[in-house]
């Protein structure tokens, strides 16, 4: 082997580096095209494996090197902010939860009008197209949602002589009886995404909302909100344990799978992990998955509505591979690929496309029978207002859960808590007015 | 009873003060360009890693910058807006309570621990090393273990208390706002204690033994010796330790983020966690920067006063 002296090595490498710098691009040998994708870890890990498989398959077909980076969902917000701030990072990125990113990062996301129009007809059209258009443009593709049914313990319901609870009031009654025998109802009320989802669902079901259709008027101060708050106070004090104030997104899953909670308002992830890990009902040999069922998200006096994490996908416009990235999105959104991906996720990851809500997976297990029904009443978190950076901030700062919790725990009266939330939201919406 | 002083350690410390290396250092000191060259790297590191981010965040706090936008100058608008926000006022209150309580606990317990370590004769090194553990383990990791211990459903603390029949219900460590604050203070104290103990121990070791003997012959008891010899002589060390710890405690992020995420209803948010939520998660960089810089003027005053105290105490020596 020829020996290279230190001096020679330095001269060659320094020269090479200077050359590359002067040309502003990598030398030809290194010029393979590379597409990078930042995504979040799914609660059903097979979903990620299928996505990776499709990404690699597409890469092999198109002779593109691909890299899929998967991070925990809580890290995504900071990661996006850092990439935008630095104007560099991945080409494709997961966005959300919520469609607010399209407004927040409007100037940094590539237009996806062409892709959105291409993929829709093949999949039976978008579920609710007008919700996904931000300032009249497709800045992201809504990707998947985990609908929120009610996950219940059928054996405990039977013990209580409860047939099919359907309204929030029914669940208060069931929860009260359940709590008396050590099996409380469970819904997060702290700083977690699930708390946002369930408490917004209750607010709407009682006829309340926090922002008007115009996306400006704060509508939280209403008698409907008061009703919803009184209901949640009763639910908290009579049917739940105080621990729900400190729950994170995985706590309710644990509560159900530990055999404690009689019911939780949650996607099918708890059931999926119970099934996979063969969790048993404490003190018995019976698998807990066998006594879990999923039923419709509850109805309130005014409506039956729910929301969920609207996970989306977009392309940074500072990416050098916008066209390649679009090509992959077209590939992934082909019916057969989406079908396989939903299959892999056992339906946890429901796309916002009509045909996919009728995927055979939802008929494969009776557990999933209500999921398409729940999807029909699922609206974006800012409903009836549009998705904006402001609505995203209301979500990120947990204003809704905090409003409910401050009243439920007796820290504030209903009026005080509403006034508090109203003021915070007015400040957020006023501070988010777009510069002309 | 006689307080022991490790003479060897004192001798070593004294020896470190001198240590003449005449020839080489004389040359280096006189050669100004060489001196600049040596200071250069540190200076540039400070400039880019401390001064630049600081000036940038100062600018951010006075602008309406959002993620991806440099923003334009808005004066003190961000600060005015913060003062109108209930969440921020709560954060301000939490930060003061958290810092005051944690600092007091760390100072008192740290002093006790240092005195105990000082009197230790057997397994001295092993125990002194072990005491440092909480400080060495990455905070995010150790706090996660604390979270498991206090986690609502499987709390091992509650399990133990219930098994010992001390309580018959689950104590809501994290769901109750006051207990949650207690828990984050507890974990912060646990983590910061070694820093106090070991630094104060170094101070104790440096106090000449003769002073205690003189005090003893003047009839001072153990408490008198502690108040009139130990405390005054430890003051400079104590001031520096408290100063550093005040800054670190006020800027704590990991413990709250892992244990409570600022909840329940923002009752445990600190400047760093709220600034993170506002600045990075919601993209309001200007306001996020304003949150983290809010205490800067106060801290500056504290640093100034404390450093003056240290200097005075040093002169008294």
Predicted regions and their residues:
Chain B
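Transmembrane alpha-helical segments of polytopic membrane transport and secretion proteins
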Residues: 1-39, 122-124, 307-317
């Amino acid at each position: 082997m020829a020996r290279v002296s230190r001096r020679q090595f330095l001269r060659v490498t320094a020269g090479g580096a200077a050359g590359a710098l002067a040309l502003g691009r990598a030398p030809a040998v290194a010029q393979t095209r590379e597409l990078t994708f930042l995504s979040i870890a799914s609660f059903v890990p097979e979903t990620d494996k299928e996505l990776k498989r499709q990404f690699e398959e597409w890469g092999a077909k198109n002779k593109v090197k691909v890299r899929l980076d998967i991070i925990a969902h809580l890290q995504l917000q900071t990661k996006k902010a850092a990439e935008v701030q630095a104007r560099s990072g991945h080409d494709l990125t997961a966005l959300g939860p919520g469609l607010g990113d399209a407004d927040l990062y409007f100037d940094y996301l590539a237009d996806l009008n062409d892709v959105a129009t291409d993929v829709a007809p093949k999949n039976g059209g978008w579920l609710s197209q007008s919700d996904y258009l931000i300032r009249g443009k497709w800045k992201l593709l809504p990707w998947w949602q985990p609908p929120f049914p009610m996950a219940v313990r059928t054996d405990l319901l039977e013990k209580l002589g409860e047939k099919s609870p359907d309204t929030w009031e029914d669940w208060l009654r069931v929860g009260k009886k359940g709590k008396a025998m050590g099996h409380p109802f469970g819904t997060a009320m702290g700083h977690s995404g699930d708390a946002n989802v369930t408490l917004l669902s209750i607010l709407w079901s009682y006829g309340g909302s926090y922002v008007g259709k115009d996306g400006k008027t704060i509508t939280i101060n209403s008698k409907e909100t008061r009703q919803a708050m009184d209901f949640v106070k009763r639910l908290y004090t009579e049917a739940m344990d105080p621990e729900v104030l400190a729950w994170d997104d995985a706590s309710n899953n644990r509560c159900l799978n530990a055999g404690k909670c009689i019911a939780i308002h949650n996607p099918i992830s708890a059931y999926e992990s119970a099934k996979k890990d063969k969790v048993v009902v404490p003190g018995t040999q019976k698998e807990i998955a066998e006594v879990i069922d999923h039923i419709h998200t509850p109805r309130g006096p005014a409506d039956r509505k729910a929301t969920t994490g609207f996970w989306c996908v977009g392309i940074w416009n500072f990416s050098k591979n916008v066209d390649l990235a679009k090509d992959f999105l077209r590939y992934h959104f082909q019916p057969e690929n989406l079908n396989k991906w939903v299959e892999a996720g056992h339906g946890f990851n429901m796309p916002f496309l009509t045909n996919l809500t009728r995927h055979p997976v939802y008929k494969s297990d009776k557990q999933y029978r209500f999921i398409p029904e729940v999807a029909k009443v699922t609206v974006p978190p800012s409903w009836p207002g549009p998705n904006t950076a402001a609505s995203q901030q209301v979500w990120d700062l947990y204003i809704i859960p905090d409003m409910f919790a401050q009243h439920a725990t007796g820290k504030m009266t209903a009026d005080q808590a509403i006034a508090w939330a109203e003021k915070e939201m007015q400040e957020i919406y006023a501070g988010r007015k777009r510069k002309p | 009873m006689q307080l022991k002083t490790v003479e060897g350690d004192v001798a070593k410390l004294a020896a470190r003060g001198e240590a003449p290396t005449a020839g080489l250092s004389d040359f280096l000191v006189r050669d100004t360009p060489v001196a600049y060259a040596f200071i250069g790297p540190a200076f540039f590191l400070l400039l880019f890693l401390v001064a630049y981010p600081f000036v940038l965040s100062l600018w951010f706090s006075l602008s309406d910058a959002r993620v991806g936008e440099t923003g334009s100058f808005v004066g003190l608008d961000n600060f005015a807006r913060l003062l109108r926000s209930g969440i921020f006022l709560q954060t301000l209150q939490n930060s003061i309570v958290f810092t005051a309580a944690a600092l007091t606990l760390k100072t008192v317990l740290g002093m006790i621990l240092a005195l105990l370590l000082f009197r230790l004769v057997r397994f001295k090194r092993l125990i002194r090393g072990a005491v440092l553990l909480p400080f060495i383990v990455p905070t995010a990791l150790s706090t996660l273990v604390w979270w498991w211990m206090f986690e609502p459903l499987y709390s091992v603390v509650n399990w133990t208390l219930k098994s010992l029949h001390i309580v018959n219900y689950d104590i809501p460590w994290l769901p109750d706002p006051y207990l949650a604050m207690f828990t984050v203070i507890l974990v912060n104290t646990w983590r910061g204690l070694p820093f106090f103990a070991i630094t104060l121990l170094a101070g104790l070791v440096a106090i000449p033994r003769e002073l205690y003997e003189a005090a003893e012959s003047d009839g001072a008891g153990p408490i008198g010796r502690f108040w009139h010899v130990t405390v005054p002589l430890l003051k400079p060390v104590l001031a520096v330790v408290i100063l550093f710890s005040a800054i670190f405690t006020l800027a704590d992020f990991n413990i709250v983020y892992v244990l409570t995420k600022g909840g329940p209803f923002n009752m445990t948010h600190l400047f760093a966690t709220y600034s993170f939520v506002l600045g990075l998660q919601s993209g309001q960089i200007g306001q996020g920067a304003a949150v983290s810089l809010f205490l800067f003027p106060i801290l500056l005053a504290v640093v100034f006063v404390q450093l003056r105290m240290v200097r005075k105490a040093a002169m008294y020596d």
